[in-house]
């Protein structure tokens, strides 16, 4: 069995139904369920007595009140059921397109939601768990293009992925692991329609799929890969044509280029849903051996289809106007990561600070740790092994011993800098700092008290800011002087924090519109880290972050200048096209 041929005319005749179905599912999730579950999670967190949830307080949060923890578990399980239902509704809709029975738009929706209700009544924990694991882990392509909100939160932050990819053998191991997951997904893919569409247990559905793919793994892997490739090719080819047209339009007057840009934005969104429809129909047709029916055109149906498409185009046009005409909702601050830019020296050293300050970033982010003798030194890592080749912690050596050590990075060699020297030189250069306090179990109990007593006045006078992963640091700073801006670093976007921090420094790959909207409502600032790629930059601009922490200051500055002074609509459309696919890091 292979994929059935799918004529473009038949696909076009059903595009309006797909648009209608996705619009309804989107409205239910975006404006009903996501706000509700977000409110519920925040309410439960408040009952624990904690203001935030992060890796360093998760155990304390979930052990604070067992009744609340039970409610957290229930909310988590309900969200899994909602994700299962969201996928199921879409599958039922596509299945109804493959039926031989012709339906009106209302009949299509009625049948889809009726079948989805039956599917939900048949749901069992084993079915939900299988679908969540399949879509969330084994075949993440599905959850990405279908934009399954809660499954898309199952991702590894980009800074961890980048680290793993930079380790040669780990990179190879990850590639092999991803290939194995794909092959497992192929072995189990025929179980998916059985679970959704038939009243059989998961065990039998899995056995059916294993039997069907036995000794034909490469055959089915090729067919699934071909469906994915053709779907993405349709989208990519359409986007290339639109971008080519927009490049020409950008040479004309701004009014003409903006008008054509909005028109291309509409076509891009339609191309995305066309690609999505193509993939879903081909995928389910492949799994069920059913083809999309070619019904005779009824009188009046083109008008209804035209009306649905017209409304969709008007919505897309409004979205396109906002996206293209206001590419930068806020002008983000440019922040050098660890005091370097484009590998211009060794991180967290005075020599690199002097070079980076010439680029005039708004802030230079740097890292401070306590030493054995209660002084403060510039160091990011928990040990000295990477930079100095010594397996010691900064807290195990005195400041004098540390500043005598040679450190190496990016082809440069220098000495470790003390915080006193670094701060003094930054003040001389007129360079504001974003001072990150790194804490450890070896720190003295009065570390922050001594730090603030010695440096707080200078930090305030020169307009420096502070940040930390440790919320005790945030509390100490605010108790000492509420006028010092201090940011709480969050490596992962979970429950929205309700803290007294001036703002949040968030790992960019887990950021989403829901978090940013709440930031604006709470009158806090948002910094994103670490932004080094075109996709990450585009996402940060789109979300409207207040600051961008980067390893390449000049690149971010040029990107901001271009969007402010001479925005190229072709570039914006290209960024949006990538964003629509919603792959990790976008």
Question: At which residue positions do the language-model features occur?
Answer:
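Hydrophobic alpha-helical membrane segments
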Residues: 1-334
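Phosphate-group recognition and catalysis centered on beta-loop-alpha active-site segments
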Residues: 290-586
């Amino acid at each position: 069995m292979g994929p059935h041929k799918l004529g473009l005319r038949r696909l076009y005749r059903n595009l309006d139904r797909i648009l209608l179905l996705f619009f309804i599912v989107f409205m239910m999730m975006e404006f009903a369920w996501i706000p509700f579950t977000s409110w519920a999670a925040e309410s439960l967190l408040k009952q624990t007595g904690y203001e935030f949830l992060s890796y360093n307080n998760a155990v304390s949060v979930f052990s604070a009140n067992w009744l609340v923890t039970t409610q957290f578990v229930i909310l988590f399980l309900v969200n899994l059921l909602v994700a299962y239902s969201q996928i199921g509704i879409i599958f039922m809709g596509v299945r109804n397109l493959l039926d031989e029975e012709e339906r009106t738009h209302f009949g299509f929706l009625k049948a889809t939601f009726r079948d989805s209700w039956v599917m939900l009544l048949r749901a069992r924990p084993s079915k939900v768990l299988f679908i969540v694991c399949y879509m969330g882990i084994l075949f993440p392509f599905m959850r990405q293009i279908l934009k399954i909100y809660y499954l898309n939160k199952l991702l590894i932050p980009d800074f961890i992925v980048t680290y793993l990819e930079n380790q040669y053998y780990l990179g190879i191991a990850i590639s092999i692991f991803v290939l194995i997951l794909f092959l497992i997904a192929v072995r189990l893919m025929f179980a998916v329609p059985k679970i959704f569409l038939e009243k059989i247990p998961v065990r039998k559905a899995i056995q059916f799929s294993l039997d069907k793919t036995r000794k034909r793994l490469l055959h089915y892997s090729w067919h699934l890969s071909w469906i994915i490739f053709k779907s993405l090719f349709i989208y990519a080819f359409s986007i290339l044509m639109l971008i080519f047209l927009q490049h020409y339009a950008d040479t004309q007057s701004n009014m003409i280029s903006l008008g054509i840009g909005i028109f291309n934005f509409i076509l891009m969104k339609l191309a995305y849903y066309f690609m999505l429809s193509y993939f879903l129909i081909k995928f389910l047709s492949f799994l069920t051996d059913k083809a999309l029916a070619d019904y005779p055109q009824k009188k009046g149906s083109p008008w209804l289809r035209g009306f649905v498409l017209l409304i969709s185009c008007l919505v897309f046009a409004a979205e396109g106007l906002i996206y293209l005409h206001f590419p930068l909702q806020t002008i983000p601050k440019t922040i050098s990561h660890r005091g370097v830019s484009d590998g211009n020296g060794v991180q967290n050293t005075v020599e690199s600070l002097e070079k980076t300050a010439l680029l005039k970033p708004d802030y230079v982010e740097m890292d401070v740790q306590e030493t054995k003798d209660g002084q403060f030194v510039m160091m990011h890592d928990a040990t000295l092994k990477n930079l100095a080749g010594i397996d010691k912690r900064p807290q195990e050596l005195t400041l004098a011993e540390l500043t005598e050590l040679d450190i190496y990075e990016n082809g440069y060699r220098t000495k470790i800098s003390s915080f006193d020297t670094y701060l003094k030189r930054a003040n001389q250069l007129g360079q504001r700092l974003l001072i990150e306090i790194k804490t450890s179990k070896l720190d003295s109990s009065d570390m922050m008290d001594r730090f603030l007593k010695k440096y707080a006045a200078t930090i305030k006078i020169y307009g420096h800011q502070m940040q930390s992963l440790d919320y005790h640091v945030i509390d100490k700073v605010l108790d000492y002087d509420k006028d010092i801006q201090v940011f709480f670093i969050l490596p992962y976007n979970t429950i929205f924090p309700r803290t007294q921090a001036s703002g949040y420094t968030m790992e960019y790959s887990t950021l989403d519109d829901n978090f940013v909207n709440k930031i604006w409502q709470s009158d806090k600032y948002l910094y994103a880290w670490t932004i080094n790629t075109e996709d990450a930059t585009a996402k940060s601009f789109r979300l409207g972050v207040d600051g961008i922490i980067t390893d390449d200051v000049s690149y971010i500055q040029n990107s901001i200048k271009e969007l402010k002074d001479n925005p190229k609509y072709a570039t914006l459309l290209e960024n949006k096209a990538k964003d629509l696919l919603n792959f990790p890091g976008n």
